[in-house]
Amino acid sequence: ILIDHHPYPDDFANFTISDTSVSSTAELVFEFILSLNSINEIDKNIAECLYAGILTDTGNFSYNSSNPRTFEIAAELLKKKINKDHIFKNIYDNYALSRWKLLGYCLYEKRNILHEFKVGYISISKQELEDFDFVPGDTEGFVNYPLSVKGIVVSALFIEKNDIIKISFRSKGEYAVNELAKQYFNGGGHKNAAGGE
């Protein structure tokens, strides 16, 4: 079984549930459970996982969340007595000081804004990651910072890892970064959030 909300899911499963209009795979999992008339099987632990999936894929409900159904599902999960503030804190307020220092370094030294192209990007070398005691997850969300600059509609984050450069793309509006990632960087993703290498 494959449950995915990304465009062009892999074709390896006997049964696929795919819908790119939903906020997250967690939302699809909820709907799948609901379709089996098994809503009562969602206990607090499952509800916490589904809520965390929706929370992270929507950037705390700041994107991929214009469908009222996303909020209806979140409300159903809250009825399971989950602690949404605890979930938020564990995801977004749980970073090491080294991550904060790396972010400051990237925003001050490594950011590039190309106003004429409406593009901003950050690049980080393997050595720089080591210098800041990088652990997986430390660069989560860095790609979004250039989009906060007025007039910027596309952002990218380039991270050197061993023999490859990992790339994350974000965009606003009609700029389809998933097509860029697919065509040039062996990647893919959503229209406004994609990656490649």
Segment roles from a protein language model:
Residues 1:
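N-terminal small/polar loop signature for handling phosphorylated ligands or for N-terminal nucleophile
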Residues 55-184, 189-197:
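Hydrophobic helix-and-loop "lid/oligomerization" segment in the mid-to-C-terminal part
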